[in-house]
Amino acid sequence: FAIRRTDPQTGEAEWIPAYGLKAFSPIAAGYPWSHYPDFGAQRSYGYARPHLGNDILGALGTPICAVEGGTVEALGWNQYGGWRIGIRSDDRKRYYYYAHLRKDTPYAEGLAVGQRVQAGDVIGFMGRTGYSAQENVNNIETVHLHFGLQLIFDESQKECDSEIWIDVYPIIELLASHCSSVARDPQTGRWERLYPYCDLDAEPLRSAAAR
């Protein structure tokens, strides 16, 4: 992958090749959070079911980042997850689910279904929406992000009785030291990453450089 930095001598932006993890923590750098192993714990709202993810506790409005690059497949209200985002990886084998986002302003500005996002991009903000058939309701007691990961080896597995959701607790532990640094532009109000990122396997550098 490559990271865009500003040359201190010329002041011009340049793309610098880099090596390492192509995945980021779902929590932006500098924001406190905590979690515990809760995969498989029982949930009772609506119907009895196991918890198919990991709850990450933090402060209201904490920026949420895309763990892996991919395409936004789901965006909007779900009575269980509240305001949520579903992102499919570029190879279409992983589906990332981010739920219980902030009331009123759950998403990063301009986020839309069909949009491609890079790993580490701000996609939304932590909240406590959900557990309501009515939209935009805070019915979750504790502010947190529900983060889930579904493995999809065949499209028939996307929505069925044999979906494969995995325990992401160890993944979040691994990514805790690899967080995306972000900041809010005081003029536009948009949240941007401090070091723009380009996955060279998914997007040609010359295309990214044109942005």
Show the residue positions of the predicted features.
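Structural recognition of the beta-strand scaffold that forms the well-ordered cores
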Residues: 55-57, 64-66, 86-88, 95-99, ...
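Residue-level signal for secondary-structure boundary sites
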Residues: 64, 106, 155-157
